[in-house]
């Protein structure tokens, strides 16, 4: 866990630094900073001066989190899903069911905060899309899965909220939410990082020889596949720039289709 969190722009220029309170999380717009306690017992929201705006504690460990502006979706070990508002208030709560162990393993929320994706349970596991209706959420899609993950699972909506990427064994699943159909993108290794943008998406998989970096679009062929000699790659997409964290360095690649 770092002592401080350092902010830089996409040109690699230093912006500011604040004290770290745990595992830092930044929303997709780069405006709101959160911190997960190192023992997974709580969540804090922090301003740009490093002051704690609010703090929540949980009776069981936090297992997954997703951010959209000033709202955050929290998954807990006991199978509860919480939607937390701008002031740290719980504005919606749901319990996962249908599994022997009702744990929340993954979640995602759309940029407009109208849909939540939920990967839950052990024996069996399921993937659900929840649609916002006023102050409630109703189930839009539910998939029964044959996976057996015992850790956090990566999920990511595309910016238009039509597709959801979800982790599968050696690759990615692609859910077309409108048609309620699924497809797959194959890759060796274990998914380590995933992000989706308007024009393309990117994923990095840890393999025996390093990493496999994929650039792709939903329901189409892979645009780019590259083997990297490092085992762990962090990535984010900002506009049409791919930001890579490799061996303590931040790299920026501007992508253009020829």
Residue ranges and their predicted role:
Residues 11, 49, 78, 87, ...:
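Solvent-exposed strand-loop boundary residues in beta-sheet-rich modules
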Residues 19-31, 57-70, 101-109, 147-156, ...:
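Repeated scaffold domains used in trafficking and secretory/extracellular systems
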Residues 163-258:
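Hydrophilic extracytoplasmic domains
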Residues 1-31:
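Post-signal peptide N-terminal segment of secreted/secretory-pathway proteins
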Residues 10-19, 50-57, 90-98, 138-146, ...:
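A short beta-strand motif characteristic of beta-propeller blades
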Residues 55, 61-140:
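Solenoidal tandem-repeat scaffolds enriched in leucines and small polar residues
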Residues 32-34, 72, 115-116, 164, ...:
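Hydrophobic beta-strand positions that form the internal "hydrophobic ladder"
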Residues 2-8, 40-44, 79-84, 124-130, ...:
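Structural motif
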């Amino acid at each position: 866990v770092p002592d401080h969190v350092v902010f830089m722009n996409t040109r690699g220029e230093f912006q500011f630094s604040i004290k770290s309170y745990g595992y830092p999380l930044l929303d997709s717009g780069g405006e709101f900073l959160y911190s997960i306690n190192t023992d997974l017992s709580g969540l804090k929201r922090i301003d740009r001066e490093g002051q704690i705006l609010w703090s929540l504690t949980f009776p069981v460990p936090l297992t997954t989190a997703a951010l959209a502006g000033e709202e955050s979706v929290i998954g807990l070990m006991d199978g509860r899903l919480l939607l937390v508002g701008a002031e740290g208030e719980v504005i919606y709560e749901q319990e996962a069911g249908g599994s022997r162990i009702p744990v929340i393993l993954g979640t995602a929320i759309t940029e407009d905060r109208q849909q939540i994706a939920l990967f839950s349970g052990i024996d069996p596991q399921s993937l659900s899309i929840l649609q916002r209706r006023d102050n409630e959420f109703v189930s839009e899609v539910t998939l029964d899965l044959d996976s057996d993950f015992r850790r956090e699972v990566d999920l990511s909506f595309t910016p238009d909220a039509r597709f959801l990427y979800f982790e599968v064994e050696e690759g990615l699943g692609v859910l077309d939410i409108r048609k309620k159909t699924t497809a797959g993108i194959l890759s060796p290794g274990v998914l380590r990082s995933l992000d989706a943008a308007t024009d393309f998406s990117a994923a990095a998989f840890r393999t025996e020889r390093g990493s496999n970096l994929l650039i792709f679009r939903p329901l189409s062929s892979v645009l780019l596949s590259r083997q990297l000699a490092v085992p762990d790659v962090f990535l984010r997409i900002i506009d049409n720039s791919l930001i890579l964290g490799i061996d303590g360095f931040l790299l920026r690649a501007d992508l253009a289709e020829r």
